[in-house]
Amino acid sequence: MLPIDQIVTQAMAAEPERLRRHVAQLSIVRNQLLNPRAIDRVVRYIADEFDHAGLPVQAEPFHWWPSGWRRHKNLIATIPVPSAGDGGDERIIIGAHYDSVPFSPGADDNASGVAVLLEAARVCAGFGRAPRRRIDFIAFGMEEEGYVGSDHHASSLARRGVPVAAMVSLECVGYTDRRPHSQQIIPGLPIRVPDRGTFLAVIGNRPASPLADALERLVQLVAPKFESVTLVVDDNGRALPATRLSDHAPFWDRGYPALLLTDTAFLRNPHYHQPHDLPETLDVEFMTHVARCVVALTLTLAFGDLPREPAA
């Protein structure tokens, strides 16, 4: 197990200017059905950034019949385990979707998530040690059409019996609003939520409860002034459908422990799915805190013992 001070030091290597640059490059209307050339440009950018981080990149193709069986793809960059790794086939998955809805440049949704994904991959790769558990950084395609890419990947893992120690979905992680009452709240939430939109929401299924607890502890070490709010849902969030609206849901439905990290999207951001979802609306300091927390969690899970539910 790594000393926590080494994890914190490495997490602090996430740089705001890199996040800003990624968002600027990714914030173009990029929808597979309307402008596949823009999708190709974004895919090349993501692949190049993974390559610059020194990570092997694999394209995972899939088809979707409403698009005329056109081929789409996920991009997977991997930090492998050595052949004698004691984590076996277990893997850690950090994911974010790279597509946008038609007519929106999607800075928050979801250039912000991909930016954090790329920066987390760079910082984790720069740690320079082989982990106990394989780490996959995945840029998912076709999320806006119903989590098609992530569903394909989760289905493939489940079919092959591949164990997933943790999945983290990065969905809209760049928008804040410090005004009172700027945060909308889902009816029926079993927790209290601040009325200012300045926190990161961490939402997990029941198997991910220990992961959420571990992340809460790491937030206090990596970003003590950063506010996060955690919600663990039963029955994979079916009683609260808004908690299922991203690429973590296919993993929940196959029994894998998964967390959603989000600024809560339309519950806070008036630019959501609009032509004015632009880079200048984002809070890069907030994104930097998210990236550092993701790095800390990833390294903790990849190099240490997995957190468990306390014994009853």
Segment roles from a protein language model:
Residues 23, 27-34, 50-54, 79, ...:
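Sec/Tat-exported extracytoplasmic proteins
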Residues 1-38, 99, 268-277:
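N-terminal capping segment at the start of a domain
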Residues 82-91:
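Proline/glycine-enriched tight loop/beta-turn segments at coil->beta junctions
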Residues 21-82, 228-232:
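A non-catalytic alpha/beta surface segment that caps or lines the substrate-entry region
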Residues 70-71, 100-213, 240-243:
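Acidic/histidine-rich catalytic neighborhood of metal-dependent amide-processing enzymes
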Residues 180-312:
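Active-site-adjacent substrate-binding region
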Residues 18-21, 25, 37, 41, ...:
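Extracytoplasmic/secreted proteins, especially bacterial periplasmic and envelope-associated proteins
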Residues 22-25, 76-78, 92-95, 136-139, ...:
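Structural recognition of the beta-strand scaffold that forms the well-ordered cores
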